[in-house]
Amino acid sequence: MIKTVLFGACGKMGKVIGKALIDATDIELVGAIDPYFKGEKYEKIIGIDKISLEVVESIDELQEDFDVAIDFTNAEAAYQNIKKVLQKGKRMVVGTTGLTQEMMEEFKDLAVKNKTAILIAPNFALGAVLMIQLAKQVVKYFPDVEIIELHHNEKADAPSGTAILTAEVLREEMKKYNLTHKDATKIEKLPGARGGKLDSINIHSVRLPGLVAHQEVIFGGLGQTLSIRHDALSRECYIPGVLMAVREIVKREGFFYGLESFLNREEA
């Protein structure tokens, strides 16, 4: 049985993950952490009576030992949470976005120093991970590519972590084959009309109520276009990826970025 604790347990994503952890037969939720709901009964918050768990403010208040901590909070909170967990020699699965490259280098050092493991994934939807892998294959033949990502209007950061990861993967693949994306635009009549850029790859962000999380990678070629799109229709789509990450991270040591690190289970 893998013992887990959950940071951001009472948030929108946290409640969905909490229910899934409780329902899993090989995983046990032993700690629910959320400073905004300190002292409340977690079973009442998520509407499940299978457990009796009091929400605590921080990991320092936990009485139970654990194997894996899961974080879906914000970048500022996650930074402190991750450091504490890794320093304890415990494993970590992180879905929080907005973490900087400098932070990740620090986490990598902590994981190695404490002989533990951390996975940071911009997206836990298996369909989104496969979308990136498919796009990696396509860009060899269609190097003219742009990314459109669409999210709910409460998302704080833009572009999304998934869009950035997609662009990074495509950039590296294009470098490998010495490919370039041609863009003749010289005048933007409105600043930012062509979106943000990661090297030569344009990323366009849409924020609207009614959306959840969506991304389209559009490739253009002579007389044709090819689009790869993923739509997250509810937060439940992330659950299979989160559970897979929890089950796999206990077998690993080191720093991992992106759920694709765990897709080939035979390598674990």
UniProtKB/Swiss-Prot annotation:
CDD domains for this protein: DHDPR_N
Subcellular location: Cytoplasm
Binding site for (S)-2,3,4,5-tetrahydrodipicolinate: 152, 161-162
Tagged with keyword Amino-acid biosynthesis: yes
Record SUPFAM superfamilies: Glyceraldehyde-3-phosphate dehydrogenase-like, C-terminal domain, NAD(P)-binding Rossmann-fold domains
Catalytic residues as annotated in Swiss-Prot or TrEMBL: 151, 155
Keywords associated with the record: Amino-acid biosynthesis, Cytoplasm, Diaminopimelate biosynthesis, Lysine biosynthesis, NAD, NADP, Oxidoreductase
Catalytic activity reported: (S)-2,3,4,5-tetrahydrodipicolinate + NAD(+) + H2O = (2S,4S)-4-hydroxy-2,3,4,5-tetrahydrodipicolinate + NADH + H(+); (S)-2,3,4,5-tetrahydrodipicolinate + NADP(+) + H2O = (2S,4S)-4-hydroxy-2,3,4,5-tetrahydrodipicolinate + NADPH + H(+)
Enzyme class: oxidoreductase
GO CC, alphabetical: cytosol
GO molecular function: 4-hydroxy-tetrahydrodipicolinate reductase; NAD binding; NADP binding; oxidoreductase activity, acting on CH or CH2 groups, NAD or NADP as acceptor
Keyword presence, Ion transport: no
UniProt-listed Enzyme Commission number(s): 1.17.1.8
GO terms (BP aspect): diaminopimelate biosynthetic process; lysine biosynthetic process via diaminopimelate
Pathway membership: Amino-acid biosynthesis; L-lysine biosynthesis via DAP pathway; (S)-tetrahydrodipicolinate from L-aspartate: step 4/4
Predominant cellular place of this UniProt entry's protein: cytoplasm
HAMAP family linked to this entry: DapB
Family in the record: Belongs to the DapB family.
Function: Catalyzes the conversion of 4-hydroxy-tetrahydrodipicolinate (HTPA) to tetrahydrodipicolinate.
Record protein name field: 4-hydroxy-tetrahydrodipicolinate reductase
Organism field: Dictyoglomus turgidum (strain DSM 6724 / Z-1310)
Taxon lineage: Bacteria, Pseudomonadati, Dictyoglomota, Dictyoglomia, Dictyoglomales
